[in-house]
Amino acid sequence: MKCGLEIHVQLDTRSKLFCRCPTDYQEAPPNTNICPVCLNQPGAKPYPPNRSALEGALKIALMLDCRINPEITYFMRKHYNYPDLPSGYQRTSIPVGLEGELNGVRIREVHIEEDPGQYKPDQGTVDFNRSGIPLIEIVTEPDMTSPEEARNFLRELIRVLEYSGCARGEGTMRADVNISLEGGKRVEIKNINSIKGAYKALKFEMIRQKNLLKRGVEVKQETRAFLESQMITVSMRLKEEAEDYRYIPDPDLPPMKFTDEVVEGLRERIPEAPHLKVKRFMEEYGLREEDARVLTSELELADAFEEVAGSIDPEFAALWMRDELKRVLYYNKISFAESMITPGDIIELLAMIRKKEITSKAAKKIIEEMPLNKKGPREIATEMGLIGIIDESEVIRAVEQAIRENPGAVEDYHAGKEAAINFLVGQVMRMTRGKAEPERTVELIKERI
């Protein structure tokens, strides 16, 4: 199987690509964020291209290791008829970035285009609020050989786009998938709006084409639509070629050239790409790849880890941030950036554990209270009465009492039920109000039973 992708994602700008209409179309009433330009009314001329969109596209191209097109850049008119395209053509630039690479997949080109409106054929309505919003299109070479590879590539690409701060992420992603099997012809699949959808579409299409080839039936070169509700693809039309779109330079828009000075200025401002950060975290901090990927899942989380690792043992910091911090963020359905937790808060909490001011069990309770809380970990610990680790003699007394009062758990442990130990540890924690160290408590229990 050979697979290539064309990914479209909205750029995060305040105004549209060729006019000054706002881009917050999702909450606006239908056909309110519009003007004669984004409706392509007769006599309406486009503004010069949105500078933020151009810079965003260049930043993303650089993060994908593309070389920036040194030639004059200009916009073309791509002609086709559809109800969401009032002019009968879509403005799309020639490539701004070429010959990049991500996850072992070659990037053929990166360019900018305008989003069409939203057509709802079941209702017979068109909303032009989205019309003219800047898109970035990323075109890969057909380097992926399985649905899993395509899914992994898309996940990594979304991470790059989120790190860039220039794109709106998976929620605005639309992908076209090109797939061919040996002995068959290339088929394009449209109407894919998620990473999961791309994976399911490829799985279905791969099986469909295999079955056709086994029966000696020709695989037609065509465009198919993915029906997400049924997880199948259906034929739309024969595959178009570039000449079918009748590309011509747009006479209303001036050509542009990105100077070396502009490109290098942008290169200095782009963040380290997530896949490069993963590699550096493994080399610099001795982390496993799995841990490094979790800690780089958000740019803000990765930056926080680096700050914490400057004061706390990196492996200890990674353990707590990977397991406990991510657990709490997931439970609260918020990102690290939204949590209001600072690197200083994490340093303070981990230092309290290291100094044996609190137990690891107490620290887990404290970190659960930290999101969206203006109080620091020490203040939270004081209010909850969690400061202090009791003397071991008190722990021993609690252990012996737990063993005496729960002979059934002791018998279960001797019968091979390891979970019985956890029950006894829980009893000790209850008696000591969580101030006994769980690991040492387990040792004391095992010594006595």
UniProtKB/Swiss-Prot annotation:
EC number(s) from the headed UniProt entry: 6.3.5.-
Reaction(s) catalysed by this chain's protein: L-glutamyl-tRNA(Gln) + L-glutamine + ATP + H2O = L-glutaminyl-tRNA(Gln) + L-glutamate + ADP + phosphate + H(+); L-aspartyl-tRNA(Asn) + L-glutamine + ATP + H2O = L-asparaginyl-tRNA(Asn) + L-glutamate + ADP + phosphate + 2 H(+)
Enzyme class, spelled out: ligase
Domain of life: Archaea
A GO BP annotation: glutaminyl-tRNAGln biosynthesis via transamidation
Alphabetical keyword list: ATP-binding, Ligase, Nucleotide-binding, Protein biosynthesis
The keyword Glycosyltransferase appears for this protein: no
GO molecular function, one term: asparaginyl-tRNA synthase (glutamine-hydrolyzing) activity
Matching PROSITE patterns: GATB (PS01234)
Entry-linked PANTHER family: GLUTAMYL-TRNA GLN AMIDOTRANSFERASE SUBUNIT B MITOCHONDRIAL AND PROKARYOTIC PET112-RELATED (PTHR11659), GLUTAMYL-TRNA(GLN) AMIDOTRANSFERASE SUBUNIT B, MITOCHONDRIAL (PTHR11659:SF0)
Complexes and interactors: Heterotrimer of A, B and C subunits.
Protein name: Aspartyl/glutamyl-tRNA(Asn/Gln) amidotransferase subunit B
Gene name per UniProt: gatB
